[in-house]
Amino acid sequence: MNKLNILIRFDDICPTMDYSQFKKATDLLDKYNVHPLIGVIPECQDEELLIEEYHSDFWNYIKELEKKGYKIAMHGFNHVYDTKTRGNINCGFKSEFAGHSFIKQYEKIKKGKEILESHNVYTDVFFAPSHSYDDNTLRALSKCGFKYISDGYSKKIIRRYGIKCVPCRTTGVPKIKNKGNYTAVFHAHEWVRSDKAHAYNELENLLKKYSNSIKDFDIFVDQPQGNYAIQNIIEKVTVFYLRYIKSKLSYVKHNVLKP
């Protein structure tokens, strides 16, 4: 592995997504021969993602992307938040998984995997909507045969309940230094919004500047695991900062120290 390794991840891929925006993404990715990790929602019921009419050729489209080298992940089950629980790492009080019993989560994950496999889509990679999951999620993933979750605030891969947690330390494009492992997250359907349109330019700039450091998922995860105790502390400190310190510092900056 190189000193600098970057993974590109796209969330919210489903039959009713904004195909024109996602095509903008795939055109750029193809130009630089980059193969992202894409999160496919097995049975999307999120009203915010019901953007276009259901595309009956969606699953064939996913298989074509897979043939090009895209890595498929399962992104939740229906992408509907039905608990008001934070989970292990996220700041918001909403989740599709965290807070549910092991059995409930196992049933969701098992059914989601069955839907994917009914369309000949097979994967052992998962990530939850809004980065919200808990220990029961990891246990259920392990029982369902998953091996990876693209999430967590450690700096190196660690293993929990048999699942390799591949760090995803931001909800967008991280500040990239000259070494380290980074996951850049994109939501193509949001690019139509004035406050999110810049993300397309961020993708383009990332591809232009770092194309040689962007790795396919299978290569990206081929790295030594970190020391669990150390990485667990790093994650807990980061979560504490994001939940309890960052907002207070922002308040001071904009309301106390403003000119």
Model regions: which residues?
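Active-site beta->alpha N-cap acidic-glycine motif
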Residues: 1-68
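Hydrophobic faces of well-ordered beta-strands that scaffold small-molecule active sites
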Residues: 6-10, 36-38, 72-75, 123-126, ...
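Acidic-and-aromatic substrate-binding clefts and catalytic sites of carbohydrate-active enzymes
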Residues: 13-21, 43-57, 84, 102, ...
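A general structural detector for well-ordered alpha-helical segments in enzyme core domains, enriched
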Residues: 21-25, 57-62, 108, 112-115, ...
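C-terminal domain-boundary segment and adjacent tail
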Residues: 33-40, 191-259
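Short, flexible, mixed-charge acidic loops at enzyme active sites
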Residues: 80-92
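Catalytic domains of cell-wall/extracellular-matrix polysaccharide-remodeling enzymes
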Residues: 96-169, 197
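A conserved mid-domain beta-alpha-beta active-site/ligand-binding segment of alpha/beta enzyme cores
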Residues: 160-161, 165-204, 215-222
